[in-house]
């Protein structure tokens, strides 16, 4: 027994709701994955604020129809498609997928969309190579901290060097 029209409308509405909260969507070919492997992929993506949705291409096509932000996805809707919907940590989610793909060697990255722009495999890999948001924040904080430390040392050095100069002058007067 197939899905009713009402079921399909609910699925499309759910996909549209998920896409509204999504920053980036990646399309992969999941053919050959077992249910356990798909569950493993979902578990790896969850900490990065991403989810893996598997649905018929026709339903996804209806969900993105008329939405300029996601219409470029239609270029990759063929065969067995799984959709990685990334909401938060782009780099972390891509790295989680890449680790899964490296371990299973069963999926193929087709492409993705971010802010209405289609992304090639190379673009997605480049985003995955970027440091995570936490690492970038730590690097910026470290740079700011080192600047303030150098300024503090510089400010303290002026009176210290003056005191050393006065001490040296005083010592030279005592010696003479």
From Swiss-Prot:
Q: Ribosomal protein among the record's keywords? A: yes
Pfam families for this protein? Ribosomal_L10 (PF00466)
Q: What are the entry keywords? A: Ribonucleoprotein, Ribosomal protein, RNA-binding, rRNA-binding
One of the GO BP terms on file: translation
Entry GO MF terms: large ribosomal subunit rRNA binding; structural constituent of ribosome
The UniProt entry's sequence similarity note says:
Belongs to the universal ribosomal protein uL10 family.
NCBIfam families reported for this sequence = PRK00099.1-1
Q: What name has this protein been given in UniProt?
A: Large ribosomal subunit protein uL10
Q: Which gene encodes it?
A: rplJ
């Amino acid at each position: 027994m197939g899905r009713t029209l009402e079921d399909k409308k609910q699925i499309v509405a759910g996909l549209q709701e998920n896409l509204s909260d999504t920053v980036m969507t990646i399309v992969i070919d999941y053919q050959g994955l077992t249910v356990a492997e798909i569950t493993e992929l979902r578990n790896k993506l969850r900490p990065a604020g991403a989810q893996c949705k598997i649905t018929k291409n026709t339903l996804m096509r209806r969900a993105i129809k008329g939405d300029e932000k996601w219409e470029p996805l239609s270029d990759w809707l063929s065969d067995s498609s799984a959709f990685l919907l990334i909401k938060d940590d782009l780099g972390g989610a891509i790295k989680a997928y890449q680790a899964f793909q490296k371990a299973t060697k069963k999926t193929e990255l087709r492409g993705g969309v971010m802010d209405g722009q289609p992304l090639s495999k190379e673009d997605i890999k480049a985003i995955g190579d970027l440091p995570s948001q936490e690492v970038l924040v730590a690097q910026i904080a470290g740079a700011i901290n080192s600047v303030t430390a150098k300024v503090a040392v510089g400010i303290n050095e002026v009176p210290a060097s003056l005191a050393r100069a006065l001490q040296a002058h005083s010592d030279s007067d005592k010696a003479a």
